[in-house]
A protein has these predicted regions:
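NAD(P)+-binding Rossmann beta1-loop-alpha1 motif at the extreme N-terminus of oxidoreductases
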Residues: 1-63, 86
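Rossmann-fold dinucleotide-binding core
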Residues: 4, 93-174
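Amphipathic alpha-helical hairpins
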Residues: 15, 53, 60, 66, ...
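Hydrophobic residues within alpha-helices
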Residues: 16-17, 36, 102, 147, ...
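Hydrophobic beta-strand scaffold residues
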Residues: 27, 47, 113-114, 155, ...
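Rossmann-fold NAD(P) dinucleotide-binding segment
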Residues: 51-112
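Helical "substrate-binding/catalytic lid" subdomain
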Residues: 164-281
């Protein structure tokens, strides 16, 4: 039976290991905090004493690590032990520039590399659900595609440019965190006005706030700031109301939005659509 290696058994990595084990795949794991790796031994994983030992003889290698520096450090440690031709699949969320440079360094060393960050929770990883992005050489992707598809609900191959998956992962997480900040402000305003925050969230069962992504998002991307369906000046008035409704309680997102709106208004954009909150290169169309 082919054996794979997974480096990094935090919450997400452990979920992936459990999914592999449930599918009958033999998995060797290593983690910087050994206890986290040891917890998977009872479920059938083999725990290696070092990352090099984990990847030695493995037919495929997976990384689920916290940051670029750790990824680079582990790669240096495992490089001599990698089986010739094995594909290293990195699921870590990393900087696009760092990912591109990493891919080039590895290519020069003859190491096959694919970046495949994910949008999934630990439970989704264990269940083989969610979305996996992938970018890197077509040949490498084609070779591991079936295995990656078995790990998730959908694999989206973005192309050969090695940093695309890293960038798209940050795009997605940017919206996740921005929405989380807006939700935090809704909770603050609700409490300040004697409304149960759980009840306040019911507005989003009727008002589909996410539609702005598909509506205004493309306009902002193209720099189309006129005609205005929601002018910056009117939106700024509403943001002022939100800040006032919080009754001196600190908000997460709205003060930053207010600052950007003030910049746009000062630059003559009061009558532009709120798509003008995007980069200053925006032009009226």
């Amino acid at each position: 039976m082919a054996r794979i290696a997974l480096i990094g058994t935090g919450m997400l990595g452990s979920g992936m290991v459990r999914h592999f084990l449930k599918s009958g795949t033999e998995v060797t794991v290593w983690n910087r905090t050994e206890e986290k790796a040891r917890a998977l031994a009872a479920e059938g994983a083999t725990v290696a004493a070092s990352p090099a030992a984990a990847v030695s003889g493995a037919s495929r290698v997976h990384f689920v690590l916290p940051d670029d520096a750790i990824v680079d450090g582990i790669l240096d440690r495992i490089a001599p032990a990698l089986t010739d031709g094995v594909v290293v699949v990195d699921h870590s969320t990393t900087l696009p520039e760092g990912t591109a440079k990493r891919a080039e360094r590895l290519r020069a060393r003859g190491i096959r590399f694919l970046h495949a960050p994910v949008f999934m929770s630990p439970q989704m990883a264990a269940d083989g659900a969610g979305l996996m992005l992938a970018s890197g050489p077509q040949r490498e992707f084609d070779e591991v595609r079936a295995a990656l598809e078995g790990m998730t609900g959908e694999v989206w191959y973005l192309g050969a440019r090695p940093d695309l998956a890293a960038a798209y992962k940050l795009f997605g997480n940017c919206m996740l965190f921005a929405i989380s900040g807006g939700l935090a402000d809704v909770v603050t305003m609700a409490r300040a006005n004697g409304i149960d925050p759980v009840d306040a969230m019911s507005v989003f069962t009727k008002f589909q706030a996410g539609n702005i992504i598909h509506g205004r998002g493309p306009r902002m991307a193209r720099g189309e700031v006129t005609p205005a369906s929601f002018a910056v000046a009117m939106a700024r008035k509403d943001v002022a109301l939100m800040i006032a409704a919080a009754k001196d309680q600190p908000l997460v997102a709205m003060p930053c939005v207010a600052k950007r709106m003030d910049e746009v208004i000062a630059a003559g954009g009061a009558g532009m659509d709120i798509a003008a909150l995007g980069p200053a290169r925006a032009t009226a169309k």
